[in-house]
């Protein structure tokens, strides 16, 4: 089992009555992809549910649930060498875990258009994922602001991290 840190969180985003809602999920759900998907499916939204998961200072995952369909994005596939959640995302996507010699760069993987209908295109998502000056929580906060649920996201992160 990988150590959970204070910078780990899983925030569920969904719309209710045309208002973005954000809910902190127990950080324990980040221990497996099945737990993340199961927790997101329990939410009351009749539309899309988005999970924004930060794992330490290393990487983030975006999970999007629409009915029975699951779309996934991981900010750095090389995280799969050390982190079970990233490895499970790659397995779900049918992408091989990289070899050690492939670990010299940040490589996003998955559905690059996962947020395109919300105003974040593939190029922007890749650029933010590859920005080595930003931590995963900062990238997710930036995405939340751009999409329009920044304040709700910030409150949920504060709740999740005990701030």
Language model features: what each stretch is:
Residues 81-163:
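Charged, compositionally biased boundary regions
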Residues 3, 16, 21-23, 31, ...:
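Glutamate identity and glutamate-enriched acidic tracts
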Residues 2-5, 18-19, 24-82:
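Compact, well-ordered interaction domains used in eukaryotic information-processing assemblies
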Residues 10-12, 52, 89:
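Generic structural hydrophobic/aromatic packing signal, biased to beta-strands
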Residues 9, 59-60, 73, 135, ...:
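Phenylalanine-focused residue identity feature
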Residues 12-13, 63:
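Conserved hydrophobic/aromatic positions in well-ordered beta-strands
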Residues 1-12, 158-163:
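Actinobacteria-biased recognition of intrinsically disordered, low-complexity terminal regions
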């Amino acid at each position: 089992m990988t150590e959970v840190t204070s910078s780990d969180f899983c925030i569920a985003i969904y719309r209710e009555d045309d208002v973005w809602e954000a809910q902190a999920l127990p950080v324990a759900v980040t221990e497996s992809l099945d737990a993340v998907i199961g927790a997101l499916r329990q939410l009351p939204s009749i539309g899309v549910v988005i999970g924004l998961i930060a794992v330490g200072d290393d990487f983030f995952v975006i999970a999007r649930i629409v009915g029975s369909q699951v779309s996934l994005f991981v900010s750095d596939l090389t995280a799969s060498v050390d982190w079970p959640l990233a490895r499970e995302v790659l397995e779900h996507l049918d992408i091989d875990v990289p070899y050690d010699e492939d670990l010299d760069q940040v490589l996003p993987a998955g559905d690059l258009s996962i947020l395109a209908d919300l105003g974040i295109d593939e190029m922007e998502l890749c650029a933010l994922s590859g920005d080595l000056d930003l931590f995963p929580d900062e990238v997710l906060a930036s995405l939340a602001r751009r999409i329009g649920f920044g304040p709700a996201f910030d409150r949920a992160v504060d709740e999740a991290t005990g701030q």
